[in-house]
Swiss-Prot record:
Species: Homo sapiens
Sequence segments annotated as region (Linker 1): 133-143
UniProt name for this protein: Peripherin
Pfam families: Filament, Filament_head
UniProt region (Head), positions on chain: 1-99
Function: Class-III neuronal intermediate filament protein. May form an independent structural network without the involvement of other neurofilaments or may cooperate with the neuronal intermediate filament proteins NEFL, NEFH, NEFM and INA to form a filamentous network. Assembly of the neuronal intermediate filaments may be regulated by RAB7A. Plays a role in the development of unmyelinated sensory neurons. May be involved in axon elongation and axon regeneration after injury. Inhibits neurite extension in type II spiral ganglion neurons in the cochlea.
Listed Gene3D superfamilies: 1.20.5.170, Single helix bin (1.20.5.500), Vasodilator-stimulated phosphoprotein (1.20.5.1160)
Domain of life of the organism encoding this protein: Eukaryota
Alphabetical list of InterPro entries matching this protein: IF_conserved, IF_rod_dom, Intermed_filament_DNA-bd, Intermediate_filament, Keratin_I
Positions with biased composition (Basic and acidic residues): 454-470
Residues with PTM Phosphoserine: 28, 50, 59
Subunit annotation: Forms homodimers (in vitro). Homopolymerizes into a filamentous network (in vitro). Forms heterodimers with NEFL, NEFM or NEFH (in vitro). Interacts with DST (via C-terminus). Interacts with RAB7A; the interaction is direct. Interacts with PRKCE (via phorbol-ester/DAG-type 2 domain).
Length: 470
């Protein structure tokens, strides 16, 4: 018995098929699970009426064959040329089918690897999704709620601080208004004091002018007194000269009228002396009265000037103290305003920071929701891909089952047939019947593994015409 090379190819293809695919992977409940239990049987008439030619069916697990012509064996003699042509055609078809099956095996292996990878990703995404559904939202919600509570508490503290600052600001504003009112009053008093000072300066100037006028008058009166004294002295001298001359004349006249002239001269002298004394006394009294009046006026003006200077100094001291107080109040006001501005800026910055924190938390929450939605979409897309792969794998499984059912036809095992041929002896036909041997081989597979394998032979008699038609 000679073995044909196609039988080796069939065995190699079967081994390559099992080695390529192997046992299907055990996948998760939601993933693709490939389990199939296929039972197929094939029966083929493999015999002839000739006792010298026998055909035996070998093992097969090979790709589908494209030859549709049935193998016909003559009852008396095997046509080797026809078998060779069929064998060449079958080999070409088988090589093409082997290549196609190899490509299908590669694609199927790629799909299996892809399904495994997608199953791993699916399991990881399911774990992440369950964790995100079970923990992340609650934890994020707790974190957000805690952060919001802290922000609300800080906002309440800031609100109370703001109220306190506003109350303090209102009190400072009232104090500032009172200080402004006091400043206005002091400014008004200062203006009144300056006005009085101007008036006093005017009075002082008037008093100074009056004093100068009085001094000038005193000087003129002193000059007049000196002039009157000189005039009086000259008059006295003239009077003495006249008296001496009269005395000389009297001496001359005494001789004649001595008693009358003496009396007349005494009277005249007494009269002139009384007039001179009276004039001198009046001049002295007028001078003393004028001097006393001028002294009183000067004293009064000096007292008024002293009082004006004292009031001016007092007003200057008050103005200086008020100016210092106004400067201090102005500095206090500026410091309070600066502190108020700093508090407002600090409150605005803190409020902006809290608002930014709240916005950041809201953005993180939104991003978490978007990421969760994205994971859900990816999970849905993976489910869709999984369903498509399940459908495609089911389609390939059906195709493979169809191919397995087709390769179970004995024509595909033509390459594995062991043909023992002897030259038939020409004998006259004894009867019109011939025997045929039918070999039925049943193979049961599950998950790509051969579970059971059985063979059954049936022998029957047929007419020669039926055998030839086969």
């Amino acid at each position: 018995m000679s073995h044909h090379p196609s039988g080796l190819r069939a065995g190699f293809s079967s081994t390559s098929y099992r080695r390529t695919f192997g046992p299907p992977p055990s996948l998760s409940p939601g993933a693709f699970s490939y389990s199939s239990s296929s039972r197929f049987s094939s029966s083929r008439l493999l015999g002839s009426a000739s006792p010298s030619s026998s055909v035996r069916l070998g093992s097969f697990r090979s790709p589908r064959a494209g030859a549709g012509a049935l193998l016909r064996l003559p009852s008396e003699r095997l046509d080797f040329s026809m078998a060779e042509a069929l064998n060449q055609e079958f080999l070409a078809t088988r090589s093409n089918e082997k290549q196609e099956l190899q490509e299908l095996n590669d694609r199927f292996a790629n799909f299996i690897e892809k399904v495994r990878f997608l199953e791993q990703q699916n399991a990881a995404l399911r774990g992440e999704l369950s964790q995100a559904r079970g923990q992340e939202p609650a934890r994020a919600d707790q974190l957000c709620q805690q952060e919001l509570r802290e922000l609300r508490r800080e906002l309440e503290l800031l609100g109370r601080e703001r109220d306190r600052v506003q109350v303090e600001r209102d009190g400072l504003a009232e104090d500032l208004a009172a200080l402004k009112q006091r400043l206005e009053e002091e400014t008004r008093k200062r203006e009144d004091a300056e006005h009085n000072l101007v008036l006093f300066r005017k009075d002082v100037d008037d008093a100074t002018l009056s004093r100068l006028e009085l001094e000038r008058k005193i000087e003129s009166l002193m000059d007049e007194i000196e002039f009157l004294k000189k005039l009086h002295e000259e008059e006295l001298r003239d009077l003495q000269v006249s008296v001496e001359s009269q005395q000389v004349q009297q001496v001359e006249v005494e001789a004649t009228v001595k008693p009358e002239l003496t009396a007349a001269l005494r009277d005249i002298r007494a009269q002139y002396e009384s007039i001179a004394a009276k004039n001198l006394q009046e001049a002295e009294e007028w001078y003393k009265s004028k001097y006393a009046d001028l002294s009183d006026a000067a004293n009064r003006n000096h007292e008024a000037l002293r009082q004006a200077k004292q009031e001016m100094n007092e007003s200057r001291r008050q103005i200086q103290s008020l100016t210092c107080e106004v400067d201090g109040l102005r500095g206090t006001n500026e410091a309070l305003l600066r502190q108020l501005r700093e508090l407002e800026e600090q409150f605005a910055l803190e409020a902006g920071g809290y608002q930014a924190g709240a916005a950041r938390l809201e953005e993180e929450l939104r991003q978490l929701k978007e990421e969760m939605a994205r994971h859900l979409r990816e999970y849905q897309e993976l489910l869709n891909v999984k369903m498509a792969l399940d459908i495609e794998i089911a389609t390939y499984r059906k195709l493979l089952e169809g191919e397995e059912s087709r390769i179970s036809v004995p024509v595909h095992s033509f390459a594995s047939l062991n043909i023992k041929t002897t030259v038939p002896e020409v004998e006259p036909p004894q009867d019109s019947h011939s025997r045929k041997t039918v070999l039925i081989k049943t193979i049961e597979t599950r998950n790509g593994e051969v579970v059971t394998e059985s063979q059954k032979e049936q022998r029957s008699e047929l007419d020669k015409s039926s055998a030839h038609s086969y």
